[in-house]
Amino acid sequence: MPIWVDADACPKPVKEILFRAAHQRQILLTLVANQYIAVPASPFIKSLQVSSGFDVADNHIVASLVAGDLVITADIPLAADAIAKGAAVINPRGQEYTKDSIGARLNMRDFMETMRSSGVVMQDGPPPFSQQDRQSFANALDRWIARQRKI
């Protein structure tokens, strides 16, 4: 039950939660990014730097994961691809994406992208990462780990 992290934009508090969980529960954790990501010394944690380029890290994650793995990402298309391969997906704010919810998220993302590119919608991006987001992520990760332990 490895965990794959789309690490380029992953908030530091989320990485810290993942580092602790991987080490304490002996879960393989791989952070994939197109830049160097420092990780603590642990046989369960590794950082993988891929070449720069559009979706290179995303494509590596999708190619490497197997059904039952967990992917941490805020990237909706990556989440959709991971779910299609049978992975579980949680975003850094603790939202779990599923086969039932990802289609609507993709449609909304595409709609908003169209609106932004036509100049109709101006958006400053997501709100700052909060303590509530941190707690929501930790809770979602704990739920996933508990489900894996029952299998």
UniProtKB/Swiss-Prot annotation:
Family: Belongs to the UPF0178 family.
InterPro entries: UPF0178
Superkingdom of the source species: Bacteria
Span of the signal peptide: none
Protein name as catalogued: UPF0178 protein CJA_1978
UniProt xrefs under Pfam families: DUF188 (PF02639)
Organism per entry: Cellvibrio japonicus (strain Ueda107) (Pseudomonas fluorescens subsp. cellulosa)
